[in-house]
Amino acid sequence: MAKRVAIVGAGVSGLASIKCCLEEGLEPTCFERSDDLGGLWRFTEHVEEGRASLYKSVVSNSCKEMSCYPDFPFPEDYPNYVPNSHFLEYLRMYANQFNLLKCIQFKTKVCSVTKHEDFNTTGQWDVVTLCEGKQESAVFDAVMVCTGFLTNPYLPLDSFPGINTFKGQYFHSRQYKHPDIFKDKSVLVVGMGNSGTDIAVEASHLAKKVFLSTTGGAWVISRVFDSGYPWDMVFMTRFQNMFRNSLPTPIVNWLIAKKMNSWFNHANYGLIPEDRIQLREPVLNDELPGRIITGKVLIKPSIKEVKENSVVFNSSPEEEPIDIIVFATGYTFAFPFLDESVVKVEDGQASLYKYIFPAHLQKPTLAVIGLIKPLGSLLPTGDTQARWAVRVLKGVNKLPPSSVMIQEVNTRKENKPSGFGLCYCKALQSDYIAYIDELLTYIDAKPNMFSLLLTDPHLALTIFFGPCTPYQFRLTGPGKWEGARNAIMTQWDRTFKVTKTRIVKESPSPFASLLKLFSFLALLVAIFQIFL
């Protein structure tokens, strides 16, 4: 009899988890508290309790070739950076393609997940749900939690002296939907993550004045990177990842700073990060430098004091009149349906082995999927997490002893960044390629570069030097996708299809053959170093 798996949430990770369960012959039941799938990517005019919220203009920060599910490319006529409405439609297509809707119970809230009375023997869970006022309880062999980390706003008002005296309007960025509220107002956005920067830029088109307050600065990059290519298709390659990981940290930091400043000098715009030893993820925004240089956005340091109708910034004695304050200060996360004895969240971190499994459970029958913030898309990350997790839940793959897992979790906690402006989400960050490769190794699905070099050198070169697109993650092993090779070899065709809307003649490069030869030799050297 197939094992029954309860999946909490029908967002991007929940959908991947349903599919992975079906692939392994398990029986998934997904509980979604809202009336539709999509999670974060489903825009609504009003904020819904327990669900991530986004503003109308949100566009993906990862391009379509880097942010799709590994066995389901975006339609080729989609723009390279996908608006939220297109993204939601893509998720609907994914659910229909793999017949996932039959496994989802909508308008069903998970009230509690507790250990069954014989958990130490069976590993089973009691799941209590509420649907249209009716409460039900069922026993499941395993549970996959896919609720994400963007539902509980982090609003540290105690860090802003005088905020209680402010007579204007203030709210967390989670409440933001449209820029109309900023028309002819003086606006202050606190926090320079992607959301804070987006909101400041949007506000600057309508507001009287916009201030963007940042504690530590940030590197800002455009979606349009070298030679007009999508930033992540240039930046995120196996070759570059190996190169960065093989150099001393100061050199890597210097190289990254040089690259970041190639668009504009961050120091001249008051943006250069104060802590250049501990690199923060870059902020993606195509307009910010232009808004700053035209005086539409003013970069300010942290807030010293909030007054009735104004704000005083650190290192600046002047009071700046303010009508609206938007706190883009990030999120915390919690599992209200789980007891602390199952997953304890402390100081913004959960004791999860590889960001997935509670390290102390007697039976590895509960997995958390998507509670991670890679410098890359969550779709392929969640899919890879789910593939491994499902095989552990099924009993095909085994976890290390609890003591080993706890030690690794504790080590990660000790290395956690700290300080206001980093928020709890920083504790969830990981090295995208290295992390996914590690999980792929556990299920024997990591591409074997040496073998590919001998059997399919063209593919090997493309995988190593080209963008690390998700198709690589289902090239081999359990859940292998037969279309993976073709998707890899045609990834640039789909990228340019939506930009080359006017045909132009191109001259062939005389150096193309030499470049291919150099790439082949470089790959040989890299593989030789790996096997030394």
Curated annotation (Swiss-Prot):
Residues binding FAD: G9, A10, G11, V12, S13, E32, L40, W41, N61, S62
Where in the cell is the protein located? Endoplasmic reticulum membrane
Q: Which GO terms describe its molecular function?
A: flavin adenine dinucleotide binding; hypotaurine monooxygenase activity; N,N-dimethylaniline monooxygenase activity; NADP binding; trimethylamine monooxygenase activity
One Pfam match: FMO-like
Taxonomic lineage of the native organism: Eukaryota, Metazoa, Chordata, Craniata, Vertebrata
What does the record say about its membrane topology?
A: Single-pass membrane protein
Q: What does this protein do?
A: Broad spectrum monooxygenase that catalyzes the oxygenation of a wide variety of nitrogen- and sulfur-containing compounds including xenobiotics. Catalyzes the S-oxygenation of hypotaurine to produce taurine, an organic osmolyte involved in cell volume regulation as well as a variety of cytoprotective and developmental processes.
Sugar attachment sites: N120
Q: Kindly state which reaction or reactions the protein catalyses.
A: hypotaurine + NADPH + O2 + H(+) = taurine + NADP(+) + H2O; hypotaurine + NADH + O2 + H(+) = taurine + NAD(+) + H2O; trimethylamine + NADPH + O2 = trimethylamine N-oxide + NADP(+) + H2O; N,N-dimethylaniline + NADPH + O2 + H(+) = N,N-dimethylaniline N-oxide + NADP(+) + H2O
* Cited SUPFAM superfamilies: FAD/NAD(P)-binding domain
Q: Where is this site: Important for substrate binding?
A: K208
Enzyme kind, highest EC tier: oxidoreductase
Q: What is this protein called?
A: Flavin-containing monooxygenase 1
Specify whether Oxidoreductase is a keyword of the entry: yes
